Design a protein with these regions (language model features):
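Amphipathic alpha-helical scaffolding segments comprising HEAT/armadillo-like alpha-solenoid repeats
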Residues: 2, 13-25, 43-55, 72-84, ...
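Core register positions within helices of long alpha-helical scaffolds
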Residues: 7, 39, 68, 97, ...
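Alpha-helix N-cap/helix-start positions at coil->helix boundaries
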Residues: 29-31, 58-60, 87-89, 116-118, ...
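Mature soluble domains of exported/periplasmic/lumenal proteins and thiol-rich metal-chelating peptides
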Residues: 59, 108, 117, 125-128, ...
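Eukaryotic tandem repeat interaction scaffolds
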Residues: 95-97, 122-126, 131, 135, ...
């Protein structure tokens, strides 16, 4: 049955997709429901996946639906879902879906404006995964919170931008943040970063 459901997704006809929708509603099998979600993705049926992301009670299936929305670059649907969602766990999945879709703007909005500190920090880390280096540097400059600045440093390491981190290191006056930047630089395979660390170690006090 699972392979048959996936085949219907490949066919992609609206009439055919009614069958997987009915299977999803009727089935108690997580594997079968997962196959139906894959059929929806193969058929580019954003509406059906969004409905699952909104209403599914099984956390794993709901997370998979959100991930598939990201794979379909359904950024508007993810943004809408984020605004209406109250669960932190689900919101993390939505942010990860935005990362899969390469959606910088929505992640940046969450990094700037999300009142939940944990979610804000997650959005900052994911900005590094989508290569939003310039946005992270600017965010660092306007953010005074030490913990969030630490998340930005981590985001820049994820982005592999040692040069930007060196720039922040040279401007930073907080000893704890300077230490964090140095620790992250030491984990990077970056010649310029290694040279900067060596310079600081040999520099006279």
């Amino acid at each position: 049955q699972i392979e048959a459901v996936r085949a219907l997704g490949s066919a992609g006809a609206a009439d055919d997709l009614r069958a997987p929708s009915e299977i999803y509603r009727a089935s108690a099998s997580k594997a079968t429901r997962g196959a139906v979600l894959e059929a929806f993705m193969i058929a580019d049926d954003e509406k059906a996946i969004l409905e699952v992301a909104r209403t599914e009670s099984d956390r794993e299936l709901r997370g998979k639906a959100i991930q598939l929305l990201g794979a379909l670059d359904s950024t508007a649907a993810l943004a809408e879902l984020y605004k209406s969602e109250s669960s932190r766990e689900v919101k993390v999945k939505i942010l990860e879906g935005m990362m899969i879709a390469g959606e910088k703007e929505q992640l940046l909005a969450a990094a700037r404006n999300e009142p939940d500190r944990e979610l804000r920090g997650k959005a900052i880390e994911l900005l590094g995964a989508v290569g939003a280096d310039a946005e992270l540097v600017e965010l660092y400059r306007v953010t005074q919170d030490r913990e969030l600045r630490g998340k930005i440093i981590q985001g820049l390491m994820i982005a592999g931008n040692g040069k930007a981190m060196i720039g922040l290191l040279r401007q930073e006056t907080d000893p704890e943040l300077k230490k964090q930047i140095l620790q992250h630089l030491s984990m990077m395979d970056d010649e310029e970063a290694m040279n900067e660390i060596e310079r600081l170690l040999t520099e006279k006090p």
